A protein has these predicted regions:
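Scaffold signal of the M16-like zinc-metallopeptidase fold and its non-catalytic homologs
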Residues: 20-23, 161-210, 231, 264
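An aromatic/glycine/proline-enriched structural segment found at the starts
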Residues: 21-28, 186, 215-266
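M16/insulysin-pitrilysin zinc metalloprotease superfamily fold
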Residues: 90-93, 121-151
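Extracytoplasmic
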Residues: 35-38, 44-47, 57-61, 65-67, ...
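Hydrophobic h-region of N-terminal signal peptides that target proteins for export
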Residues: 9-18
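Positively charged n-region of N-terminal signal peptides that target proteins for export
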Residues: 1-4
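M16/MPP (pitrilysin/insulinase) zinc-metallopeptidase core fold and M16-derived inactive scaffolds
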Residues: 63-123, 163, 184-187
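Acidic/histidine-enriched alpha-helical segments
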Residues: 100-105, 141-159, 170, 223, ...
């Protein structure tokens, strides 16, 4: 009996000691970061292309970024928002519904905006995904019907924020911080949106959606020599142009602390 008690006590002490061992385990080795050097080339129109082959997964991603200087939209604030909404609604070559159906069929993800585009999907569809992205970006289909729809959506979105203190405060904050004449301080309103016409959107696209300051980054399970041929074929026709480089004075600090109030009905 005495021997059994001694054994039980020893087991109890061992378990208790192990349970109280809260020392931090030794860290494992740091993961190795392997940053591959991209293959780069530039098209005659100024588009800069960076390609990184990564064969770990059968996927590919494309990112088109247009690095233009900021610009003021003035009394037509909202023209860039509407340009973003209209790019990608099909193309002059493919109707909107057919375009979207093919993107879904490929299981791809393609997005467009006023300063570029992005796409991703399975590498076996790499060429077709790039074709669709290039088509939507370079040959946008700007129609009055789609313009009116997107314009109404933008105005409706503003109306839903009219009683949101945080939303209004955020917009007013930019005006106070940068000034209403600075690109970062312009105030979007229903009035400025209504000032925008379809021709304004087309002009905005022609002026700022240009290849001179554009970068196309391609990463995935592709071969550089093959993707280069596709890029040259698809983006070569993009008309060479440079966006205007406007300059603005830097915002100045106020001379003394100010408290600004916005009268909210609620």
């Amino acid at each position: 009996m005495k021997k059994s008690l001694i054994i039980l006590a020893s087991l109890f002490l061992t378990i208790t000691t192990q349970a109280q061992d809260r020392s931090q385990p030794k860290p494992g080795p740091s993961p190795a970061i392997n940053l591959k050097k991209p293959t780069t080339f530039t098209l005659p129109n100024g588009l800069k292309v960076l390609v990184v082959e990564d064969h770990k997964l059968p996927r590919v991603s494309y990112s088109l970024s247009i690095d233009n200087a900021p610009y003021a939209e003035g009394d037509k604030k909202g023209v860039s928002d509407l340009t973003s909404s209209l790019i990608g609604n099909g193309s002059t070559k493919t109707p909107k519904d057919v375009f979207n159906e093919e993107v879904d069929f490929l299981g791809a993800n393609i997005n467009f905006y006023a300063s570029g585009a992005s796409a991703s999907g399975l590498s076996k569809h790499a060429t077709r995904i790039l074709e669709l992205m290039a088509e939507g970006a370079i040959m946008p289909n700007f129609t009055q019907e789609e313009f009116d729809k997107e314009k109404d959506k933008l105005i409706e979105g503003l109306k839903t924020q009219e009683k949101s203190v945080s939303a209004v405060a955020s917009r007013v904050e930019d005006v106070l911080a940068y000034g209403k004449n600075h690109p970062a301080g312009e105030y979007l309103s229903e009035e400025t949106i209504k000032n925008v016409s379809l021709s304004d959107v087309k002009q905005n696209y022609r002026t700022y959606f240009v290849p001179q300051n554009a970068y196309l980054v391609i990463i995935g399970d592709i071969k550089t020599k093959d993707i280069k041929k596709s890029v040259e074929k698809l983006f070569g026709p993009w008309v060479k142009a440079t966006a205007p480089n406007q300059t603005y004075s830097n915002p100045t600090n106020v001379q003394y602390t100010q408290i600004n109030f916005v009268d909210m009905p609620n």
